[in-house]
Design a protein with these regions (language model features):
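Amphipathic alpha-helical interface segments
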Residues: 1-149
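General N-terminal targeting signals
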Residues: 40, 171-172
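Histidine-centered, metal-coordinating catalytic motifs and their short helical/loop contexts
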Residues: 145-171
Length: 172
């Protein structure tokens, strides 16, 4: 059961990474175009294309963030992954984490840090385990989940009140 859940989470991470990477690339492209416009006085004039670009990028970014905070039954999102980790913290054990430390790159990093692989990986895992020690601390994950939801709240309001439909209520 634990391996099935772990494998499911790994598949989710691939989906989440692809979605977040897309958001990051879209953001980069949008701001590169803004730099082109800002650095070229000849094209700095009102334009329906610029309005379109802002609207499409804004809607896409807001919906992309919104996707990552949904915890519906069939959703794959960062929030749902964090919630499942909170509910099943023993799946992310120190032993499982250490099993992924292989290869010369880790040895080089540990050596650069003036450490051994064992000490380096233990110190790194301790950030996630806290006082619990043998698996991730669900309270730390819960804090991350709460921060994600808090920061995404304005995007959700905007999406609900301006993108999905136009609401009479202000976004505030």
């Amino acid at each position: 059961m634990m391996d099935d859940t772990f494998n499911k989470w790994n598949k989710w991470i691939d989906v989440i990474l692809a979605e977040i990477t897309k958001l990051s690339i879209d953001r980069h492209i949008f701001w590169e175009v803004q730099d082109i416009i800002n650095n070229n006085p000849k094209i700095q004039k009102p334009s329906s294309f610029y309005d379109f670009l802002r609207n499409v990028y804004g809607a896409s970014a807001v919906m992309g963030v919104r996707k990552q905070v949904k915890i519906d039954k069939d959703s794959i999102s960062l929030a749902k992954l964090l919630q499942e980790i909170c509910d099943n913290p023993k799946i992310l054990s120190r032993t499982r984490y250490f099993a992924h430390y292989k290869g010369s790159t880790v040895k080089k990093i540990a050596k650069l840090m003036g450490s051994t692989v064992e000490k380096y990986r233990s110190k790194e895992f301790d950030q996630f385990a806290g006082k619990i020690g043998d698996h991730v601390n669900p309270e730390l994950i819960k804090l991350d989940l709460e921060e994600l939801k808090s920061k995404a709240k304005m995007c959700e309001k905007y999406a609900d009140r301006r993108i999905a439909h136009f609401d009479e209520r202000a976004i505030s």
